[in-house]
């Protein structure tokens, strides 16, 4: 499923009709006034998850790149909890001055709006999107010694009276909602086991305490290569992953509607001066496209995919609508 992406053609058509001679000095003056010496002190990069995950690792790589380009320290701070709400609320409460950047993924930025009736922030009203950073496929994995050898084995076992147990990072997480979509699609009998994060879920999977789970590629690809788990399907990619060419996509397996990717991105508080938001966008795009960043995350099955600010805002809007509908259909609500 491809998401609608905006472009700048209408903007370019409008601006090319204006006198170029007058635009240049006005634009330069406005840009300089908007920056006003920014950045003049350290910047906080807020990660709404615990330290140690791939999002945290990516954040630290990008923070180092930004520190070098902006000539100011960029300090990564972890504020996990409540599905990313604690971190998002912290950024919402900071001044709109560009000194606090929110890193987030599809959970706190889109899915929470459908999960939490009393969510205390609105992503597109309270924050200014900067850029998408990564597109992240996932893998449906089973224990190495599982009797489930193929996708069809999973479908047949899930439809049986006994059914299957699947793990997730927690109630309301993307793997949880996706597995419920899958269960509805195949009319299966799956039982959810919620964990506090991906690591304990994967440990129980390898020990055989659960039958299957959906996991991000940075943690699952190494385990597949080491023979500790087996991957039966790729979710969120149009093509098979070059790291695991033997593993089919869910589109190939007849369920293209379930082929939805995850993604990550960066935002600042709404009201941040345009010049600062544009500067951060440009520097983040350069940082995430650095050869070492691209190599590192491509090896882990992720796609470096920066966007314009408008494109990222439209992505958040579209995903919030889509996941809100899915969450209502599967009946998951959190306090």
Give the ranges of each region predicted by the language model:
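N-terminal secretory signal peptides
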Residues: 1-25
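N-terminal (or domain-start) structured segment
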Residues: 31-124, 187-211, 216, 223, ...
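Hinge/capping helix and adjacent helix->loop/strand transition within the periplasmic-binding protein
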Residues: 93-99, 114-200, 250, 263-295
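Sec-exported extracytoplasmic/periplasmic mature domains
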Residues: 63, 67, 71, 92-96, ...
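Short beta-strand/turn micro-motifs at beta-sheet edges
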Residues: 33-35, 126-130, 251-257
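An extracytoplasmic/periplasmic, membrane-proximal ligand-sensing/linker region
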Residues: 38-42, 188, 225, 274-335
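C-terminal lobe and pocket-closing loops
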Residues: 220-289, 318-321
């Amino acid at each position: 499923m491809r998401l609608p992406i905006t472009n700048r053609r209408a903007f370019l058509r409008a601006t090319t009709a204006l006198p170029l001679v007058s635009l240049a000095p006005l634009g330069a003056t406005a840009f300089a006034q908007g920056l006003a010496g920014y950045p003049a002190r350290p910047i906080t990069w807020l990660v709404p998850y615990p330290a140690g995950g791939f999002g945290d690792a990516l954040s630290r790589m990008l923070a180092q790149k930004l520190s070098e380009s902006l000539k100011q320290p960029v300090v990564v701070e972890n504020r996990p909890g409540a599905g990313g709400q604690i971190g998002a609320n912290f950024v919402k409460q900071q001044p709109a001055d560009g000194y606090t950047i929110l890193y987030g993924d599809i959970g706190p930025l889109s899915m929470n709006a459908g999960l939490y009736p009393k969510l205390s922030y609105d992503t597109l009203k309270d924050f200014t999107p900067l850029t998408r950073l990564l597109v992240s496929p996932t893998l449906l994995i089973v224990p190495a010694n599982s009797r489930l050898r193929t996708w069809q084995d999973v479908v047949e076992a899930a439809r049986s009276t006994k059914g299957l147990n699947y793990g997730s990072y927690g109630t309301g997480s993307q793997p949880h909602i996706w597995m419920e979509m899958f269960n509805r699609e195949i009319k299966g009998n799956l039982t959810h086991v919620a964990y506090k994060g991906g690591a304990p879920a994967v440990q129980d999977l390898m020990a055989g305490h659960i039958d299957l789970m959906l996991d991000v590629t940075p943690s699952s690809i190494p385990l597949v290569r080491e023979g500790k788990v087996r991957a039966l399907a790729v979710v969120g990619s149009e093509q098979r992953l070059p790291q695991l060419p033997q593993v089919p996509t869910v589109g190939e397996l007849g369920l293209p509607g379930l082929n939805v990717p995850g993604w990550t991105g960066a935002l600042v508080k709404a009201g941040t001066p345009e010049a600062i938001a544009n500067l951060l966008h440009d520097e983040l795009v350069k940082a995430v496209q650095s050869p070492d960043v691209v190599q590192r995350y491509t090896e882990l099955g992720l796609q470096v995919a920066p966007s314009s600010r408008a494109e990222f805002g439209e992505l958040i809007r579209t995903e919030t609508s889509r996941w809100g509908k899915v969450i209502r259909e599967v009946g998951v609500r959190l306090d």
